[in-house]
Amino acid sequence: MGNHLSDAMKILESGKLETEQGQEGRKMSWKEIPGPLQGDGQDVVSILQLVQNLMHGDDEEQGHRMQFVGEQGHMALLGHSLAAYISVLERERLRKLTTRILSDTTLWLCRLFRYENGSAYFHEDDREGLLKVCRLVMNTHYEDFTTEGFTALSSKHPVIYQSAACRPGLGQHLCSQLGLPLSCLCVVPCNTMFGSLHQMDVALLDKLVKDDRDSGKLPLLLIANAGTPGAGHTDKLSRLKELCVQYNMWLHVEGVNLATLVLGQVSSTVTAATKCDSMTLTPGPWLGLPAVPAVTLYRHEDPALSLAAGLTSSQPVEKLRALPLWLSLQYLGHDGIVERIKHASQLSQQLLEHLKTLASIKTSVEDELNSPVVVFRFSHENSAPSSGGSVEGSYAGERDILDAFNRWLGDQLAEQVPLSGVDVVELEDEGTCVRFSPLMTAAALGTQENDVAALVEKLAEMIPLLCCTLRLRQDFRDEVLQQASLSYIEDLNWPGLGVVRFEPRTTDLDEDKRQDRVEKINSDLLKKLMELDTDLNFSGGPEFSEEKNCIFIGIATEDLDVAELVETIMSLGRDIEESGKLFENMTEVVRKGIQEAELQLQKANEEKLMEEGVLRQIPLVSSVLNWFSPVQASVKGRTFNLAEGCLDSTEPVYSIKAQMRKEDSPDSPKANTRRFPGQKLFRRPGAGSDSISETSSVSQLEESFRETLHSQAADEAEVPQERPAHILEETAIADQRVPEGQEAESVETIR
């Protein structure tokens, strides 16, 4: 067993896949329907290789591989294998062994987290412990609950109280599993005037409990937080415990801040959790241990009720859940456990100290001296006002825009500094914030001090970009509104300069055709803007955005020339619109010209046939007649003049073309301006070293774009796609001619 486990870890963590031939076979077959089991079975290495292929799929990047779990993680994984192995022992020996494992683990956890005279329940789902505690409390208050069920609750309906800052869906899950109506759940609001906005309002809780008791209900249990899921704040546990004692309620505490109980110095607010009736711990993420169970510590004197509630079990196999944690705690030792929790707390303090020095960053922490969770948010309060006035109150939806900016900030920090473990959190009062909770991520990711320093460095680079983008956003809106052909799209969820749409000036089209033209123009305009040499990011917007056929402009720089940017978008849009009209008109004119040329050539062929007679149409006879009496005239080709829109004979084309070539000068100058190497577009003069050229970049773009359109128009005129094959030989488009020596061939011969 040990060899198999060692082989498994080596294969799954090595990152080395099978040979190239095996890779090709896997790409072709692993997603197909599996075949039957092999009769002689497979070896362990082959099975583990299959597991690895299913885990990684078609991912080629090493970053998607399973992270290295370390030696302590190997001990936790070994515990699951040992649990399966131990379960086949003799029943009496199994009972003694599981009792020892359970008692040892319970004793160690109670001492580590300062929870005296407690019992432990190990469970996979971190909500299951609270669910069992609720059953225990219901069995305590309702003696006939185990036999009569819900009818025993009819005399006094139970009430479960939870904070509004608890994790979403927790109370609903409890009611669903216990068979209670949602009316038995009471959500207590948080403070609104005094104290933390994420702490339960104790005075309001007292009032709610009194009202429920007066109405004949039974206050059953209170769920408090020692570290809310969002901001990491701790409720006033001492005051809540007093209320629970007063009204005979059970107090249950959960949260990430409970991990700090293992430290030598703990805040008094968290220390009060040791007096609660039960608490749920999640040592897996705190210590970086994969697949270890959560633990609920509780105090209760009646073991029969605990057994009825499912907190204890008479089955020895159930007690083996504690085995992975039993092995891991021994491997780490007391000092190793304390060191990991202490390291995570120090990372939080390090980040908090650096955030105090950054402008435009607001933090939301409960205790600046000891806060395991750091929540911060970009704010414009310290930003300089724009040219149009102060940012404060200068636009509607200010909160939504800042939320979008902070969402972008959190995503960028998580992408560029992945070892920091930051994520985006939505808080009811503060809005969208960035959260750093090393107690939940540092042990698994291996976060160190240099990762926090890199996080602060990236944050310092992004703050000026956010500030100037926020200032220029209103200026961009004003510039766009001054252009008749541009529409400003108000998208408060877009973290960038703004959203714009080019509107064609044609009004004689129906709505469907107009929408198609808007889509085509804005799509081509977006492609042209993305090809420009600029620091701005142009895109079509988020995948599920409500606004379609728009151009989304991303984060701006300090030296951005908004007027030049809008003028460039306007000029490029007009050129694309005019070129579209030119191509449409040209296609119609060419089509009519080809039809008229066909009629003229058909008429000329009929006249020629009448003049020559039928005998000249016979191959052998025509040769004899042509030798005695040569043909004097032939059908002349037709040339279509795009400039004048008329059909002419090809006879004078050659002489006119030759004269035009003589008059053309090969050295005629062309107006073609170029930017200096490294120069960026949309830079204000004097803003940086790139602003060197005196020529407007808009004129440069117009000139280069018109040259491209001219070449496209020439290609379209020379080879019209709608022309039949026989017309390609008979009709010369624009300035194409048929040489004199080839005019003797008739249309029928060419066909």
From Swiss-Prot:
Pfam families: PDXDC1-like_cen, PDXDC1-like_cen2, Pyridoxal_deC. Residues 659-751 are annotated as: Disordered. GO terms for cellular component: intracellular membrane-bounded organelle. Keywords: Decarboxylase, Lyase, Pyridoxal phosphate. Residues 720-729 have a biased composition (Basic and acidic residues). It is an enzyme of class 4 (lyase). One of its GO terms (molecular function) is carboxy-lyase activity. Residues 690-702 have a biased composition (Polar residues). GO terms for biological process: carboxylic acid metabolic process. The keyword GTP-binding does not apply. InterPro entries: GrpII_AminoAcid_Decarb, PDXDC1-like_2nd, PDXDC1-like_3rd, PyrdxlP-dep_de-COase, PyrdxlP-dep_Trfase, PyrdxlP-dep_Trfase_major. Its EC number is 4.1.1.-. PANTHER family: PTHR42735, PYRIDOXAL-DEPENDENT DECARBOXYLASE DOMAIN-CONTAINING PROTEIN 1-RELATED (PTHR42735:SF1). Belongs to the group II decarboxylase family. This is Pyridoxal-dependent decarboxylase domain-containing protein 1. It comes from Danio rerio (Zebrafish).
